[in-house]
From Swiss-Prot:
Binding positions (substrate): 144
Keywords, comma-separated and alphabetical: Antioxidant, Copper, Cytoplasm, Disulfide bond, Metal-binding, Oxidoreductase, Zinc
Subcellular location(s) of the protein: Cytoplasm
Catalytic activity: 2 superoxide + 2 H(+) = H2O2 + O2
Name of this protein: Superoxide dismutase [Cu-Zn]
Family per record: Belongs to the Cu-Zn superoxide dismutase family.
PANTHER family recorded: SUPEROXIDE DISMUTASE CU-ZN -RELATED
Length: 154
């Protein structure tokens, strides 16, 4: 079992923890999160980027993690970036808690997400269905108010 954790912070009041667990190289990865202080009653884009570089805030982390050269999509789509995790949904206080299992996001192997960045966006991810070029790259999810590097956990 490999475990990883990401602590989310940024230029805003948003904070959170994202946990990752993978049993073996062939198992799906479980991703669970608890995020606080985002916009109330909203859907907000949730992605993994290729770099663990946050020297210039969340923008220096790069585009969505896409080692297979696919277009942007939802976490449940066959054709999507490895780093596409869809949207988190916040409650009336701006908090979100949830989990998903994913077969593309890996902690083990050449495309491991350890050392990469989780980004929470300021807008809703259109899941690649926005009808323009930017939708196929970013889902038009907007600015990046919070992010954190994924590190190995005990």
């Amino acid at each position: 079992m490999v475990k990883a954790v990401c602590v989310l912070r940024g230029d805003s009041k948003i904070t959170g923890i994202v946990n990752f667990e993978q049993e073996s190289d062939s198992s799906p990865t479980t991703i669970s999160w608890e995020i606080s202080n985002h916009d109330a009653d909203a859907k907000r884009g949730f992605h993994i980027t290729p770099f663990g570089d946050n020297t210039n805030g969340c923008t220096s982390a790069g585009p969505h993690f896409n080692p297979h050269g696919k277009t942007h999509g939802n976490v449940t789509d066959e054709n999507r970036h490895v780093g596409d995790m869809g949207n988190i949904e916040t409650d009336c206080d701006g908090n979100s808690k949830g989990s998903i299992k994913d077969k593309l996001i890996k902690l083990i192997g050449p495309h491991s997400v350890i050392g990469r960045t989780v980004v929470i966006h300021a807008g809703t991810d259109d899941l690649g269905k926005g009808g323009n070029d930017e939708s196929l790259k970013t889902g038009n999810a907007g600015p990046r108010p919070a992010c954190g590097v994924i590190g190995v956990a005990n």
